[in-house]
């Protein structure tokens, strides 16, 4: 089940291809515009990646437990969103989808779920993620304004507990929420999400 609130031109084949890619620092693709309506191929420089590595280097990776690792994953995703947003013009991506679909550089939950999965795969390839497996995206039948909602998912390798990793609830560059998947599936929504803010509260006001 796929929802396409931002653009009617989303390409399901692109969504599948990008989700199934084997990303590397020298070549990977990201989505935006709603359901991968826009796709960018890019690479990360050594300076870019060092910003992510520094997040994990500031902790003793050998003593990190699954809970601590989830906190680091969230910080790593936030850093990658910031870096990539500057490269492809999504720095002004706002939380949610409902009020900002007319603005440039916006992501729906499908874009967020796919990109977040890609970012976590890059971190796992680098050896930063040791306590979790990266799973397929999931969709829940809890509707926001008539639309289903998707998320990236990880699984704790020790306990087998699944966690939703949801970047959609906050603006670009903010850490995603990471909550038990069962809680997310039941309709979890963080109390501090700005997704219901009025249009005049957006940090980007010019339409394109």
Please place each PLM-identified region on the residue numbering.
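Bacterial N-terminal signal peptides
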Residues: 1-5
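Boundary at the C-terminal end of the N-terminal hydrophobic targeting segment
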Residues: 8-10
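Anionic, Ser/Thr-rich low-complexity intrinsically disordered regions
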Residues: 14-17
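Acidic/histidine-rich, surface-exposed loop or edge segments in extracytoplasmic proteins
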Residues: 31-67, 90-102
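Mid-length scaffold segments of soluble, non-membrane domains
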Residues: 70-132
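Hydrophobic/aromatic-rich core segments of domains that either
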Residues: 121-182
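His-Asp-centered catalytic microenvironments across diverse enzyme cores
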Residues: 163-208
């Amino acid at each position: 089940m796929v929802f396409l609130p931002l653009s009617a031109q989303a390409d399901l084949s692109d969504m599948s291809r990008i989700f199934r890619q084997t990303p590397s620092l020298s070549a990977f693709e990201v989505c935006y515009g709603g359901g991968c309506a826009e796709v960018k191929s890019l690479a990360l420089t050594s300076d870019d990646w060092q910003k992510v590595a520094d997040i994990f280097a500031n902790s003793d990776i050998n003593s990190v437990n699954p809970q601590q690792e989830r906190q680091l994953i969230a910080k790593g995703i936030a850093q990658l969103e910031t870096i990539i947003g500057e490269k492809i013009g999504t720095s002004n991506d706002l939380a949610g989808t409902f009020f900002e679909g007319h603005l440039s550089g916006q992501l729906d939950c499908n874009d967020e779920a796919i990109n977040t999965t890609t970012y976590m795969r890059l971190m796992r390839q680098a050896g930063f993620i040791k306590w979790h497996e990266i799973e397929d995206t999931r969709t829940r039948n809890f509707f926001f304004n008539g639309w289903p909602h998707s998320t990236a998912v990880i699984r704790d390798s020790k306990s087998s507990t699944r966690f939703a990793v949801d970047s959609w609830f906050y603006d670009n560059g903010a850490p995603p929420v990471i909550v038990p998947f069962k809680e997310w599936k039941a309709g979890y929504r963080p109390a501090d999400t700005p997704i219901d803010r009025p249009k005049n509260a957006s940090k980007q006001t010019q339409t394109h």
